[in-house]
Amino acid sequence: MADLKALAEAIIKGDQNTAVEITKSALKEGAAAKSILEDGLIAGMDVIGSRFKKNEVYIPEVLIAARAMKMAMELLAPALAKAGVKPVGKFLIGTVQGDLHDIGKNLVAMMLKGAGFEVTDLGVDIGPEKFIERARATSSQLIGLSALLTTTMPGMEKTIKALRAAGVTAKIMIGGAPVTQGYADKVGADGYAPDAASAVDVAKRLVA
């Protein structure tokens, strides 16, 4: 019987080799792909997420755990597709035009993947047109806009207005160091997250 508790532990520790080995043997033993995902990988990332919120672990530990999850997911993805396991939701993310910062955005993308979302990461310095085009192409239910500078924050409002004018109905979340709940309300965003772990909670709430 596959030890999915040990798989969750391997993710928490960021032990890529063990995570991959347990995923391999679980698949070989015929464990359900959905169970490997939820009771192993997502369970481990959930623990990391809540520890991150409490400042018990920091960005390097989260990145190491996310990397272990990514390696295991590469093995698991074909089995999930075959079993018809759907993602929790489809999430499109990018840093707005004029802003080249990506650490926070990358962290949010990793945490969302860790929570079972299908994530399309557009990268940095993304204009409204690109967001519109990819939102349509991916049928994303959620769009995340990131900005790390007060000077690039207006790009969020511009992008939200453009998305709405183009008829994109996806829920829009914003975040980044200078961003606040007040600003999110002002520019008409559907959600705001102060950090990567909270972003997962907000995203889950918006797709529920």
List PLM regions with ranges.
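Immediate post-signal peptide segment of exported/extracytoplasmic ligand-binding proteins
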Residues: 80, 84-89
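Long amphipathic alpha-helical segments
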Residues: 1-81
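Glycine-rich active-site/cofactor-binding loop and its immediate structural neighborhood
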Residues: 88-122
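Cofactor-cradling patches in redox/metallo enzymes
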Residues: 108-115, 120-189, 198-204
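Short glycine-enriched loops at secondary-structure junctions
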Residues: 42, 97-99, 178
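Alpha-helix N-cap/loop-to-helix initiation residues
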Residues: 58, 100-101, 152
